[in-house]
Amino acid sequence: MGDRENVSYGSRPILAQKMNLLLRGFLLFLIGVFLALVLNLLQVQRNVTLFPPDVLSSLFSSAWWVPLCCGTAAAAIGLLYPCIDRHLGEPHKFKREWSSVMRCVAVFVGINHASAKVDFANNMQLSLTLAALSIGLWWTFDRSRSGLGLGIGISFFATLVSQLLVYNGVYEYTAPDFLYVRSWLPCIFFAGGITMGNIGRQLEMYERKALVEKSHRD
């Protein structure tokens, strides 16, 4: 009888961790979908949307799956960052508070806003400016080697996938200037990876603190 109680008690933390992981992933998914819709609204001003504007009013849009893919990617990235930190034995401790995370989100949205509102002389100037802003975002809110490496990897992979989808006619940008889109897309993906990574790390740290406090009370 006592052994059964011990097994049941020991399985509770594992079950709680799985439920917390699912909840964290769901929150990251919702944040990713929300940011995808917000950033699309910013790009509408230049007619360079990643998916047609009517997706906001109809789930039956031809590209309804794009914000869902963004949400899924956001969840994967947000869960991956703290896992990589633990695997490398380098827990991220730089600016670990919610105010810093919110500022990171604001800067990320600001970078997207700049790509939509500011008129640059040419695409090269746009690329260099956004690249500098994206690296500045990493330096200000992350500064970890794992964050930089994952950000670059995410930028390369996401840009490659998006271009393959366009070339294969799965969906297309509404902008006539395709070079303009390619000049800002990698930087946006990089900054987005850093932003979702910071959110994921903060959620994981908050969850870990809650579990520690609960274990102390028990």
Swiss-Prot record:
Keywords: Cholesterol metabolism, Endoplasmic reticulum, Lipid metabolism, Lipid-binding, Membrane, Steroid metabolism, Sterol metabolism, Transmembrane, Transmembrane helix. A motif (KxHxx) lies at residues 212-218. Pfam families: INSIG. The keyword Oxidoreductase does not apply. The chain crosses the membrane at residues 22-44, 64-81, 97-119, 123-141, 147-168, 183-200. Interacts with scap; interaction is direct and only takes place in the presence of sterols; it prevents interaction between scap and the coat protein complex II (COPII). Associates with the SCAP-SREBP complex; association is mediated via its interaction with scap and only takes place in the presence of sterols. Binds oxysterols in a pocket within their transmembrane domains and interacts with scap via transmembrane domains 3 and 4. Oxysterol-binding protein that mediates feedback control of cholesterol synthesis by controlling both endoplasmic reticulum to Golgi transport of scap and degradation of hmgcr. Acts as a negative regulator of cholesterol biosynthesis by mediating the retention of the SCAP-SREBP complex in the endoplasmic reticulum, thereby blocking the processing of sterol regulatory element-binding proteins (SREBPs). This is Insulin-induced gene 2 protein.
